[in-house]
Amino acid sequence: MGSSTGRRGLMPEAAKLIRSSDADAIARGRHGDPFAVLGPHAVKGGTVIRTFQPQARTVFVLAADGETEMSRAHPDGLFAVKLKGSPAYRLRAVRHDGGTEELDDPYRFPPVLGDLDVHLLAEGTHLRTFEKLGAQVRIVDGVAGVDFALWAPNASRVSVVGDFNGWDGRRHPMRLRHEAGMWEIFIPGLGQGAVYKYEIVASDGRLLPLKADPYGHFAEVPPKTASVVWELGRRDWADADWMAAQKARNDRHAPISIYEVHLGSWRRVPEDCNRPLSYLEMADQLGDYVADLGFTHVEFLPIHEHPFGGSWGYQPVGLFAPTSRYGTPDEFRTLVDRLHQKGIGVIIDWVAGHFPNDPHGLHHFDGTHLYEHEDPRLGVHKDWNTLIYNYGRSEVVNYLYANALYWLEQYHVDGLRVDAVASMLYLDYSREPGEWIPNRHGGNENLEAIDFLRRMNMLVYAEHPGAMTIAEESTAWPMVSRPVHLGGLGFGYKWNMGWMHDTLRYFSKDPIHRRYHHDSLTFAQLYAYHENFVLPLSHDEVVHGKGSIFGRMPGDPWQRFANLRAYYGFMWTQPGKKLLFMGQEFAQQSEWNEDASLDWHLLGDGRNEGVMRLIRDLNRLYRTEPALHQLDNEPAGFAWIDCNDRDNSVLTWLRKGFDPGDFLVVAGNYTPMVRDSYRIGVPEPGWYRELLNTDSEWYGGANIHNGGGVHTEEVPWHGHGFSICLRLPPLATCVFKRER
């Protein structure tokens, strides 16, 4: 890294081949236009070729008519020669150690970026920047190598550095395309696996910390931080059937049950230093497991490259690189492909709200606040000590737009769950008065971030109609999951954080007190159809001292398991798509630890295994019963039978599908008391079969049931002309369906 000052002045024999000031600037790594000096240049009577090879004692030009020794133009390793005509050539360098190497001259190749690309990049409207910027393996004029292109408009010099040039920034300085602030170079002879960074000199002459590639497809395994050249290229995907049905599978009328996964801690290999599974190992083990449990999708905590494992991926540096902790980009593609083949969709958490201040990342990228706001009242997130993207800059939002499309196109992911949307929407998010700047209307809305989110959603759904976007938005911001043309933000779904907090609080209460908190289970129906909601029991609820979901259930061990089963029964029969964090499907008892495997040994306990059986059956019921998913996000899909029996802590409700005669009756008894002869009204006469009972012995319960089902009686009740008398088991949710 860096450069030598060398001795000033030209070698006598080269005085006519290069100006002294140019030679000195090249040798010091301070020339602003290296392509104007290096490589071939037509002059009167022929061509002057110049190359900087500080590792070389002698350099020869190899042309069709033989080889010609170059003159040393500067003692630090600048060589030059004048040849007749304009021959095609290569270089042969004799190193100081006596070894030799043949190489193509990077400075004889044409520009990397076409004029249209430069125009679109300057506008900030190039939606496929990932195909042009970063490191792209190419063949140019019959020569294999790598195109490098980088946005750094305020830099005075940018170079590609790596093992291939001794990390010497003088070796491969790049060409500046002034109209777009893009630096570019084609380096022949490089290929997949080359390790590199960018050496950037700020406009004031400061040498900045080496930077990883913002568009890098791959990176070294942390704690190393360099980028790695990786050619994604074309893949023979085997998920054509899935992709053809993607739109139907992600539709709001479809069953969507999501298993949330942290790749590094789902399962580990204790025999091999307790390492996490690789992408390829996960492809089979996770795929089979999730398919067996009946989840329709997995959601991965952020898989973007990130330096700090304890951030769980929520502080990414390499947005275009799946983390190398578990394998290569192609192996992550294999994971997605295999999951699709097993009928499982893939959602990734997408972090577009902030980025960390690691010196090799986007922070102060070209010596200026390029990606972030300069004013800390706009550009610094105090809670996380991270930096906030400048959504008002077209090149920055173009970077994020392209990244969203990149994961959908290059990795076939089915959806993006956008993290921390509330922090993006509000200028005063987690800030005291005086710590934020109002918008142009004097309000606290981040108008630029709102425009970004709307545009991002419109692009995703226009380019990939079968995909989905999901917002983690924790406030009452209206119309998050409504179309942009109607004034919404354009997301497909929104996490229902209010439902999660209310229901967790209720089921964490001792049953004797639940009558006083009855509204915690009913309140969500007042706003349940304002958005397309996902009901989340996510990783956020099993960290930071909160314990596990099971650990928050009250009572003795039997009651805790019963409460958890009843809660899951309630969740799966309420309107909204489902999300459950890994480990909670078998009643993990300890808080989640990102450095350890889930407690799989608990499955040796029949009670934990019973909870897993329940999740499997709930997913099956949810998928196969249209009444449980077709109208998840519409008022017509739900009706209370009785929501007022707070004294007994009993709730009864109907779920409905498109077919008005296809409905389910659900009854929840959330006290440890058996409720015999409990009468509820039903809309139609007939035999009501008990489809599911969370108190079944199959799930670890006491097996108090209704003998398979009950007949209606012509006793009007709850506003219906018929009713059924049930035996409600303690701390349980039961589901009934009329036989037709």
From Swiss-Prot:
UniProt key word Glycosyltransferase: yes
Entry annotation: catalytic residues: 419, 472
Source organism, top-level taxon: Bacteria
Keywords from the UniProt entry: Carbohydrate metabolism, Glycogen biosynthesis, Glycogen metabolism, Glycosyltransferase, Transferase
GO-annotated molecular function: 1,4-alpha-glucan branching enzyme activity; cation binding; hydrolase activity, hydrolyzing O-glycosyl compounds
Keyword Glycosyltransferase carried by entry: yes
Chain segments annotated as coiled-coil in the UniProt record: none
InterPro entries: A-amylase/branching_C, Branching_enzy, GlgB, GlgB_N, GlgB_N_E_set_prok, Glyco_hydro_13_cat_dom, Glyco_hydro_13_N, Glyco_hydro_b
Enzyme Commission code: 2.4.1.18
Known catalytic reactions: Transfers a segment of a (1->4)-alpha-D-glucan chain to a primary hydroxy group in a similar glucan chain
Pathway membership, UniProt: Glycan biosynthesis; glycogen biosynthesis
Pfam families: Alpha-amylase, Alpha-amylase_C, CBM_48, GlgB_N
GO cellular component: cytosol
A biological-process GO annotation: glycogen biosynthetic process
Family indicated by similarity: Belongs to the glycosyl hydrolase 13 family. GlgB subfamily.
Subunit-structure text: Monomer.
Protein task: Catalyzes the formation of the alpha-1,6-glucosidic linkages in glycogen by scission of a 1,4-alpha-linked oligosaccharide from growing alpha-1,4-glucan chains and the subsequent attachment of the oligosaccharide to the alpha-1,6 position.
Name recorded for this polypeptide: 1,4-alpha-glucan branching enzyme GlgB
Originating organism: Paramagnetospirillum magneticum (strain ATCC 700264 / AMB-1) (Magnetospirillum magneticum)
Taxonomic path: Bacteria, Pseudomonadati, Pseudomonadota, Alphaproteobacteria, Rhodospirillales
